[in-house]
């Protein structure tokens, strides 16, 4: 995983990637939820290397996107982009813009990333996660 340290670097990562999904984890690196999500992402990265690039962004060091993506009251949020387009993911929580909790299961994340890739390649801006019981497991 590559850490992006400026708004410009985040924009360039999203704009320049033509073939893969860009996964951006916004968060506060010292927070326990962020650490859990980073562990899932680092385990998933080798399995996703052919169709996804994973980046991390410190919300406090790079506040440029806090308003745009409504990241004010979250400690971790994961978003997906493809060819400079934000891909929304319906995981059953009502908020399709981002996954705003730490996932515990690497396979769940891999499954979501695969669905995002397949849907984005077909031109879809909103994809439905393979399982929508994430909201139940979250609470």
What are these regions (language model features)?
Residues 9, 28-31, 59-62, 83-86, ...:
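Conserved beta-strand elements of beta-rich interaction domains across eukaryotes
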Residues 1-13:
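N-terminal "domain-start" segment that seeds a small globular fold
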Residues 22-25, 34-36, 51-57, 65-68, ...:
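Intrinsically disordered, low-complexity regions enriched in proline, serine, glycine
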Residues 17-29:
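Short active-site neighborhood of thiol/selenol oxidoreductases, capturing the structured segment around
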């Amino acid at each position: 995983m590559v850490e992006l340290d400026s708004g410009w670097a985040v924009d360039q990562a999203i704009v320049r990637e033509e073939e893969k999904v860009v996964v951006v984890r916004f968060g506060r690196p010292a927070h326990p939820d962020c650490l859990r999500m980073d562990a899932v992402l680092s385990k998933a990265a080798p399995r996703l290397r052919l169709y996804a690039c994973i980046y991390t962004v410190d919300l406090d060091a790079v506040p440029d996107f806090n308003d745009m993506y409504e990241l004010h009251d979250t400690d971790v949020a994961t978003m997906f982009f493809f060819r400079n387009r934000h891909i929304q993911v319906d995981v059953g929580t009502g908020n399709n813009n981002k996954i705003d909790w730490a996932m515990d299961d690497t396979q769940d994340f891999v499954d979501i990333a695969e669905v995002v890739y397949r849907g984005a390649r077909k031109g879809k801006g909103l994809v439905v996660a393979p399982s929508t019981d994430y909201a139940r497991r979250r609470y």
